[in-house]
Amino acid sequence: MNSKAISLYPFKIGDFNRDLFYKDYTKAKAHRAHKSLNIASKKRSHPSSVSFLLGCKNKHVIINPYQTLEKFVKSLHIIGFFLKKKKRILIVNTNPEYANLIENFYRSTLLKNVSVCYCNEKWVGGFLTNWKQVCRSIQTFMAFSERFSTFILQNNINFPRYKKMYTSFQGLKKEDFEKRPDLIFLINPNENRHVIEEAVSLNIPVVAITDSNTNLLGISYPIPGNSNSIEFVHYCLQWIARVIKRSSTE
């Protein structure tokens, strides 16, 4: 990617009030990673993430907030650059606790000239690498949903597979199947190595919230923080929403 072109996007670290960021960061306990007696422990901290860590306190690994701010701003910068170039961004979350958070974020950023979609709770293997086949399957489901969803709801029919598919793909629109996404924003990378591997095989960059035990291999733009903190995930999404709205007006 052209670094000179990226630098044209007007999003800088100066957009942040650093003191307020660090206050919000610690309030959300985003700096408190997993418990570990040894910062380099294979069980609790991944070697590739050690450079983002300060040390241990009360058996908790502490993530360096200065590193988080630097990497977070860089990630927002990249997201803004892709949006400005009219690229497609896919948000992936398979944590049910964050499902409503992702849905609310999506509804708040529905803009005609911005292509952002999401997969919630369940990832379909081969979604990126077997794109055409998976898209056909999802489009078949969508056609079924358009025709029978009202009937299923009105008659309170127990249809677990339909419910699971609906939950997973309600963040996708027909126009999202025109081509593969150009950038992935991954909420919980520890549970989704297969998503990263698919993206890497197709040279699709990945932005991800990375904890102390996250393997950074294949993650282009890590955001160090406690991935179990819903407040921190919400904070990240709020800033991404700002970038999306800014991009839509340029």
Predicted segments with their positions:
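Ribosome large-subunit tunnel/peptidyl-transferase-proximal elements
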Residues: 2-226, 230-250
